[in-house]
Amino acid sequence: MAPVIGAAALAVALTAPAAFAIVGIARLGGAATRARVARGSTTPVTRKAAQLPEGCTVIPRIWLPDGRWIPDVVVGPHGVAIFESLPPAAASRRTGDRWEVRFSDQTWRPIENPLQKAARDADRLRRHLDAQERDFVVRVQAAVLGDPGTVGRVDGCSVVAPDDVPAWLAALPAQRGLSPDRLAHVRELLADLA
C-alpha cells in the first residue's frame, strides 16, 4: 500500500506545478484580452486630441450610471460635446428613418438610428450632470462622425466629418457660466465615469 501512495504523491508532485502554470497562463491571457477590449481601439476624436482648441480635453469613453457608455466626450469652454460614429457605409443601409446593418452571416438586421441614439445619450449625460451640479447647467452637444453630405442632421445631433472635429468644436460658443472652477469640476465628474 505504501508504494502506491508514494507513487501517487510523486505523480501529484510532478504534475501539479505544470497544471498550475498552465491555468495561470490561461488566466493571464484572459485578463490581457479583457484589458485590450476594455481599452478598445483609439477613437477618431482621441486621434485628433492635439488639434483640438485650447482648453479642450478628450475622455475616450465614459460609462453612465445606467450602464450605457459614450465613446468620445470632449470637455471644454463650450461645455461638453459627445461624439459617436456611424456604422461603416459598406455594412449599413438606410430606408427613411430605419437603419440596418449587415452581419457576418450576410443578413440585414435593424439597429437604432445612430443620430437619435447620440441625441439621447447627450440628454442622459446632461441629466446626470444636472443631478450632480445644482448651481449651473452644463451645455451638452451631440454629434455623429460621418459624411454630412450623405447623412442629414436631426434635432439635437449634428453630423461632423472626422477631419472637421477641431473646427466644429472651435465654432461652438463658449458657455459664459462655465467658470474655470466649474469646468474643472465637470472634468472631475466625467473622469469619475471613465
Segments from the language model and where they lie:
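Surface-exposed interaction regions that form or flank ligand-binding interfaces
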Residues: 1-68, 75-80, 91, 106-194
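Active-site ExK catalytic segment of metal-dependent nucleases
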Residues: 82-90, 97
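Short, well-ordered alpha-helical microsegments
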Residues: 67-70, 85
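Surface-exposed beta-strand edges and their flanking turn/coil or helix-capping segments
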Residues: 73, 95-98
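Short glycine/proline- and charge-enriched loop/turn segments
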Residues: 97-106
